[in-house]
Amino acid sequence: MKIIELIMMEDEKRAGEDTISLVYDPAIEENFVALSKQQEGRVALSSEYMRMTLSDADKRIVTGAALVPNKPIYRNDGGDEYYIYFSKDTTRKASESFLKNGYQRSTNLEHEEGDRLKGVSVVESWIIEDEVNDKSRFYKMNLPVGTWMVSMKIDNDEVWKEYIKEGKVRGFSIEGWFVDKMKTKTKTEQARLK
């Protein structure tokens, strides 16, 4: 089965990621954690494997990987099976482009095009620089250097109660414009990744 490295397009206005979708089954196979405030003021961590215990003072923040570098991601386009991956460099460029272009509020559910969620916003973004001394370790995540992490604030009551708390969505999935690195040498073919 072929393996394709995707890179950023040269057209900066269309290049890279432009949406983060909340999904049940993220292609990067990494789920987020939902943060809630306990009565004593301590932070509790919850994931898809644990039933969340939330007080009235929910933080309503989910934190997880948006993109993991060099992780093979299975694709099947009309019977054409292959894997894609993003290098550390492309992952960093995608994260920078996302913020630079102001896409922090560009979120949807399960890649529903044109259906942008209100009251959902990326409030934190970082690249893991050190596997041991990174904030992701605090959240019990074991991810490689170069991973793009995000925290999303969920002020939308419906999304928080019906999707996050009920476990209907468990992770992030990116959408954006990328190209096959090998094909850029001969002909630029762009692909909208979802």
Question: Residue locations for each model-derived region?
Answer:
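Signature of dsDNA virion morphogenesis modules
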Residues: 1-194
